Amino acid sequence: MISTATKERTNIDLHNELIQKAEDLIPVLKERSESANADRRIPKETIQDMKDAGFFKILQPKQYGGFELDPHTFSEVQLRVAQGCMSTAWVLGVVGIHPFQLALYDEKAQQEVWGEDDNTLVSSSYAPMGQVTPVEGGFKFSGHWQWS
């Protein structure tokens, strides 16, 4: 009798795959780091590379297409990314931690963010210094914010 069972990918396997993807990305990030610093923004290609690698899904709940892994995996990936470009690692840290935080919210909030598109990225300012004014059809935001 031939077995048709396939080996499921474990969290350890996924952890190792993500670490390897981050290590593979280091040379590319090094090449782009000068332009990232000069332009004061991460190249769109770098954001796409991190999306494709699954870095923003590390802490995202499985029910919304994420890997639901531990913060250790996230920090290990971030440390590897930093070897290529510190600015990129900072952006990964700011944006990549929010799925963990959003997972602590009510299910309704998670559904609003990931219900239609589980690739939605979220970031916020931890130092709310602006003003929000209700306007017809939504809200108007104004003010100046420090780095998130």
What are these regions (language model features)?
Residues 1-20, 24:
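Basic/polar N-terminal segments that are highly enriched at the extreme N-terminus
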Residues 13, 20, 41, 68-69:
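Residue-level detector of secondary-structure boundary/capping sites
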Residues 15, 34, 117-120:
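Intrinsically disordered, low-complexity segments enriched in polar/charged residues with Gly/Pro
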Residues 25-33:
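N-terminal capping segment at the start of a domain
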Residues 42-52, 56-148:
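Glycine-rich flavin
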